[in-house]
Amino acid sequence: EATAFWVGDALQTQAFDGLSRPTGLPAERQLAMLSTLAQASGSLGMAGGQAIDLANVGKAMNQAELEQMHSLKTGALIRAAVALGTLSCPDLTPAQIQTLDHYAAKLGLAFQVIDDVLDCEADTATLGKTAGKDSDNDKPTYVKLMGLHAARTYAETLIAEAVALIEPFGDKALRLRQLAEFVTARKN
């Protein structure tokens, strides 16, 4: 796990380095991109979500609390990735940007729900991390809250809602649809 933390730190600094290089975008957009990534990875995002997760080991959480926690974890980074894409497209309207943000929020939450499901269903070799670790550590999960089948169904519903949101974009949203399919089908 220590190696994973160091790799994550290194990749994060590379992301900031990449965003700080000249791109041809207006400086205001690049600054907005840097701010978006900083918020998504800091205490208002991934780090904050992890802190909530660790603070609630052994405690019951309701669905609203779980959604808040999960929206701050990988969900925040997925939303940031989509936001960075929108910031690089000056032709998008505010309504389109909001739609894409809603897509990303649903996708990010579905990713976390699937992560909880995989922790119960997959084996350690497939997962690439210790299977059952969340359960063993008595962490709050969607599987613990609603059961395995209901958690999987909830994730599939979130994905369907996310894909429906981007339908108006047609072929321009092909990669976003493929990303949603990947999240649903992933095994690790």
Where in the sequence are the language-model features?
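Short cytosolic juxtamembrane segments of multi-pass membrane proteins
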Residues: 186-188
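Mg2+-dependent prenyl diphosphate-binding active-site environment of isoprenoid biosynthetic enzymes
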Residues: 1-165, 174-184
